[in-house]
Amino acid sequence: MKRNPIEVFSEWADLNKDYGMEKNHENSVQNMLDFAIEDKLPFTFIDAGCGNGWVVRKVSKISNCTQAVGIDGSEKMILKARKIDPKLNYYCADIMSWAPKKKVDLVHSMEVFYYLEDPKKIIDNIYKNWLNQDGRLIFGIDFYEENKTSHDWSESCGIKNMKLLSEKEWLKFLKNSGFRNVKTWKCGAKKDWEGTLIISGKR
């Protein structure tokens, strides 16, 4: 029987599968950060769907990052993140409706948005309630229409409600929310693997 994503990822936290995700996603995340972080300009940062907090820890060490925050729907993942580094700020909440007390300059997410009931809603929420003017959203996904190898993941992982969308559909979500300078590219393509689809736009 398929389960909701929070249940599955909470179980993965117990089984330490989150460390495997960190290893598998590291190159794509670095590619996104290299693109999004402008040299020497101070910035604030949120990782949406932060898991065990590895990206938050990574970004917090960048000299011009003045604040790095993580949010995740899995209490077990957040507890793990806080245990690894109690000094950083982590929130366990529904990212569809949550909003930071103070807007930020950069929102990042890796392998999260297609698990949500309404991906367009989180993109709208980030645009309206998370980002400063000229702030940037950047996110990566491996489960998308053009990446045929990924199509059976909902069945093989036993996760319900996964949204299989095309690159054009994701682009449209950002543009319809108001994002400008929207662009996409792929990272890590190889035989039988289209690579991580990366999408970014500015508020």
Language model region names:
Residues K120-Q133:
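A short glycine-rich, Lys/Arg-flanked "PGG" loop and its adjoining helix->strand segment in the class I
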Residues H108:
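A conserved beta-strand element that flanks and buttresses the S-adenosyl-L-methionine
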